[in-house]
Amino acid sequence: MDIMPKWVDIIVVPLLSLFLAAFLAALLILAIGESPVTALKLMIEGTLLRSAGWGYMLYYTTNFIFTGLAVSVAFHAALFNIGGEGQAMIGGLGVALVCLFVPWPHWTLAIIGASLGAALFGMIWAGLPAYLQAKKGSHIVITTIMFNFIAAGVLIFFVVDVLKPAGSMDPASANFPASTHLPTFQDIASLIGFENAFRSAPANISFFVALFACIAIWYLIWRSPLGYEIRALGKSGPAARYAGVRPVKIIMIAMMISGALCGMMAINTTQGESERLILNFTEGAGFIGIAVALMGRSHPVGVFLAALLFGFLYQGGAELALWTKIPREMIVVIQALVILFTGALSLMVRAPLERFFMSIKRADV
């Protein structure tokens, strides 16, 4: 039986964790001689009161939705997929190969092909450590971490030695054909008469693919027989095996779905924004996905809201670095505080609340 009401665990605990993180961040900003109120005002104005700010925030949000959902699926099977960075890198390679070597007549077909390529490559890359866990007993955390480094090497090899145009000094693939370029929010807004909206912002049509992924994962986890088996294995391995769930099958499937979602992040960054394959395009989104999944309690709605928050922090941090004396490193610290309190230290918030609700139940008895 749950000690706390569900709404307390889903809403109150994350909000209190955010408040503690914001309080410590305010103290740090004060310590370097800046005003926390001014900093917050700049973040809000630069992100929420300008359409371009919204465009950048939703661009980052798209990445975090994909990686947050990926980690959530693995969490439901009691697996810790810390290899999102590597799976996204390999997914980017899949996007590049599909866009460069398949003659697509229109972006509507190209995004389907790129999504399938990204998902397939990410799925395969996640399937390797999943097999080692399911069949050989290797710890999924260790293997996925190591596969991040291997993926980085694979990406460098393909970008520098295979896909880079002859004579180019830029470590990047050739530009994708124009028929594969995804419409940005600025393109969409201009069609309905708002030419100046989302100016120069990289947010693109892949945001709606991420929203569709939220709906699909919700249905998978809570409305399908496969989702029931994933949750059963995550809740109790022995009980799930007794009920007929095959752990090897579920571990493989859950991790491959997780890898596919991480790989699909590349349609936003590689096909949608840079329109070519570059190094370091993931920008840590695979690791941020862990915090997004933790804060969102591994539910697609929570993941979406947490991804929005981290998108706000990323774009707001860029505004602070531009308009204040707050160094970029301090902005990373502020983001780390949010991750720390919503993830690792959430028990510090949850424990007093559990004691409070336990005392209420005892009083009722």
Question: Where is each model-derived feature located?
Answer:
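Helix-loop-helix "hairpin" substructures at the membrane interface of multi-pass membrane proteins
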Residues: 189-193, 198-276, 300-301, 305
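Transmembrane alpha-helical segments in multi-pass inner-membrane proteins
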Residues: 256-336
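Cytosolic-side transmembrane-helix boundaries in multi-pass membrane proteins
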Residues: 1-18, 26, 235, 242-249, ...
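Transmembrane helix-bundle core of multi-pass membrane transporters
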Residues: 51, 144, 148-221, 362-364
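Interfacial/capping segments of alpha-helical transmembrane domains
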Residues: 26-47, 164-176
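Short loop segments and helix-boundary regions at transmembrane helix junctions
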Residues: 2-12, 75-84, 106-180, 223, ...
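Single transmembrane alpha-helix segments in multi-pass membrane proteins
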Residues: 27-32, 42, 47-102, 115-138, ...
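Hydrophobic core segments of alpha-helical transmembrane domains in multi-pass membrane transport
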Residues: 14-30, 67-71, 92, 96-98, ...
